[in-house]
Amino acid sequence: MAEQKTGQKADQKIRIRLKAFDHRLIDRSASEIVETAKRTGAQVRGPIPLPTKIERYTILVSPHADKDARDQYETRTHKRVLDIIDPNDKTVDALMKLELAAGVDVQIKLT
């Protein structure tokens, strides 16, 4: 670990970003991560909800005329951020073994 000028060790932090289309799935996965990290003695901040990205698509229903006949679709991408402060080896091992749902995208950054 890097040392600061005061002689203390710098705080190590794991930042986990979750993305999913289903908000129930992402909340369940976030609670599993929080529970696992707390069980191993690490301190957790979050889950912090980030703004939901909404993409809307408008499609003409008619193959020829009728500009008024349209369908509208949207996809919502929900995001959460978790910070795990001062993780130990048990925390990292438990997070690596954790099985999350297939619809959740996980990005892990160590700082």
Curated annotation (Swiss-Prot):
An example Gene Ontology biological process: translation
Sorted UniProt keywords: Ribonucleoprotein, Ribosomal protein
One Gene Ontology molecular-function label: structural constituent of ribosome
Gene Ontology CC annotation, any one: ribonucleoprotein complex
Function (record text): Involved in the binding of tRNA to the ribosomes.
Subunit structure: Part of the 30S ribosomal subunit.
HAMAP family linked: Ribosomal_uS10
Family assignment from sequence similarity: Belongs to the universal ribosomal protein uS10 family.
The protein's name: Small ribosomal subunit protein uS10
UniProt organism field: Xanthomonas euvesicatoria pv. vesicatoria (strain 85-10)
